[in-house]
Amino acid sequence: MKFFAVLALCIVGAIASPLTADEASLVQSSWKAVSHNEVEILAAVFAAYPDIQNKFPQFAGKDLASIKDTGAFATHATRIVSFLSEVIALSGNESNASAVNSLVSKLGDDHKARGVSAAQFGEFRTALVAYLSNHVSWGDNVAAAWNKALDNTYAIVVPRL
């Protein structure tokens, strides 16, 4: 359940090389364009990587088409997207680095307890970037900003797994 919140982590930008204001703006504006598509985002991740779906007890072993339109699926998708939205909103401002670090560290700790691997975080990242690149204006500048944000996030999360 929180696995995708963890995956949401994929959107920070705080530590090793903080996002510039321009990079943060690119991440924030592209996220704003899709963040209302919670169910579609989670469905895209599950479709691309069924092993991630199987980390969620309420969705494990079920056909994606049969769960996609359920309240439970929508609720969980909203939790994940809300987490990502919070982290993204905090990015680009050095005074928020501690808050981002706390949120993302907790995400790593929570997902370690669930047996989520660094490889699965990588899968989530791949699926999220694929979704974004197909649903927002995606150029080299946007791709670079997202990659930097996700690299920063993973620098916090992966060592905690």
Curated annotation (Swiss-Prot):
Ranges for domain Globin: 18-161
Gene3D superfamilies for the chain: Globins (1.10.490.10)
Cellular component annotations (GO), alphabetically ordered: extracellular region; hemoglobin complex
Alphabetized UniProt keyword annotations: Heme, Iron, Metal-binding, Oxygen transport, Signal, Transport
Signal peptide coordinates: 1-16
Amino acids binding heme b: 76, 111
Quaternary assembly: Homodimer.
Family: Belongs to the globin family.
PANTHER family for this protein: GLOBIN-LIKE PROTEIN (PTHR47217:SF1)
Protein known as: Globin CTT-VIIB-8
Organism: Chironomus thummi thummi
